[in-house]
Amino acid sequence: MKKPAIKKLHRLLLFYLLLWIILFEFILPANNFLPKPSVVLLSFDALWRDYKFPVNFLATISSVYIALIAAYFIAQYLSPIIFRKNHFLSEFLFSLHWFSIYIPWIIFGIFLIYWFPISPIIEFIFLLITAFFSLIIKIKEEASNVQKEFIESAVSLGAGENIISRKIIWKSIQPKILKHTILLHFNLWTLAIVFEFIKNGYGLGGIFRMALDYKDLSALFAVSVITGLFVFLGNSAIKFYRNKFCHWSLN
Amino acid sequence: MKTGNLLEIKDVSKFFHGSAGAKYQVLEKINLSIEKPTTGGIFASIISPLDSGKSTLMKIISAIEKPSAGEVLIEGNIYNKPDGTVVYIPEKPSSFPWMNVKQNIEFAIEVSKNPNKKNNTKIDEIISAVGLTGYEDHFPHEKSFGFRFRISLARALAAGAKIILIDDPFKSLHRETKNEIIQLIKNLSTIYNQAILFSTSNINEAVLISDKIFLLSHRPGRIFKEIEIDCTKRDEQSEYIASVKNEIEKLFQNHDKIPSFA
C-alpha cells in the first residue's frame, strides 16, 4: 500500500475511534451493540485476571507464528521437489489440495479435536499443516510462471537443477510467496481463533467463548481490538521483511 | 572426429508436439559451421523471418534444448550438456534482479563447469570490460535494458564462454544504445577472442556487423545460404553493403516467397 493510502487509513481509523468515544460514551445510552469506552478500559484489568489473557494470548500467538515461520522454511527447503514435474511427493501433496477446494479446512481441525486430547501441540500441528499446504500450492502455481529466460540463461551458464531451484526459481517467486504469506497470516489467525473457540480451551478463541458465555460485551470488544492490533503488527512485519529482502520487482 | 571448426552443427532437426498430439517441424537438417577465430574474434549472424525457429536453434546450440536429430559439436566434441562454453543470452533481459552486478557475475563463475572460466579475482576486470565500473552494487531491475544486457555479457565472459549466442539483441534498444552495445560486443570478442553468433530479422543490422551471415528459411527452418562479408568494404553508406542487402532480400523472396520480412 502506498504511503498516502496508509495515511488515509490511519485518519479513517482515528475518525471511527473518535466517533465511537463521542457516541457511545457521551450521547447514546448503554446498549448491547457496542460497549462504553470507559467500560472497555476497565475490562482490561478483568481480562488480565479473570480471563488469564497473557497465557491465552501467548498460546495463540506462539501457535500462529511458529507454524507460519516453520511452514515457510519447510516449504522453502522442499521447494526443489515441489518444482519438479511428476515427482511422486510433489504430486501427492498437490493431490491433497483437491480436498481443500471442496471441504472447508476448519473441518479438518474439528476432526483433530475429536481424534486427539486437548493440547497446544494439536493446534500447532493443525496450523502448521494449513500453512504448509497453502504455501506449497502457491509455490507450485507461481513456479510455472517464472520468466523462462532466467532459467534458460542459468542453464546455459552451467547451473544444475538444484541451483536453479534454489537460486533462480525460488528467488524469482519469493516476493509473490511473501505477498501470499500476508493473506495466509490473516487466515491462520482466523483458523486459530475458530479452532480454540470450538475446542473451548486455552487461547484467544477460549476467551471469546468465555466472554460470550458470560455475555461480557466489553471483554469481547477489548479482545477483538487487541487481536486486530496484533494482526496489523504481524502484517506490517511481513511487509517490512518483503520490502527489505525482496526489493526487486518482476512485474 | 576433430575438426578445425569451433562450432559445427550437423543435420540438426527439431520437432515439437502440439497440444492435439500433432507433430510439427521447426528446424530441418540444419548444417552450419564457424571456424575457430584466430585473432580478433568472429561475428556471425543468422537472419530469418520472424517465428522461423532462430531461438530454438540457439537453444539447441547452447544445449538448453535437445535436437530431435543431428548433433552440435564444439571443437569437434559433442556438446549436449551446458557447461558455460556456449552461453545463450535471451531476447528478454535475463540478468537476475535479486542479485546485484557483482553477484550476477559471481553466480556465473560459481555455476560454470567450463575449465576456462574466470576466477573471482577477475571480476573487477570483467566489470570494467563491459563498462560497469562503479555499478557493482547496483541491481539490474533499477536500470535500463542496455545495462542489463551488459550484465548478461559480463556473465558470459566470467563463465569463460567460447561462443556467445545472442538472441535478437537489438530489438528493444534505441539507436544510440544499440550502436554502443554493438561496439562493446565487437571489442569484447576481439579482446577475448570469442565467436559471437546472433540472430535477427533485421537484414541491415546483420550486414553491418557480421563477418558471416547464415540465411534461415521460414518454417521448417533450413540454412539455405551462407554469405561472407568483406569487412574492408563495410560502411553504412557503401554500395557494397546496399548490394549485399539487396541480394539477401532477393534470396529470401525467391526461397520463401515472402515479399519482405524485416
Predicted features, each with a name:
Chain B
Residues 62:
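Helix-to-loop junction immediately C-terminal to a conserved catalytic motif
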Residues 153:
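Hydrophobic anchor residue at the start of the ABC signature
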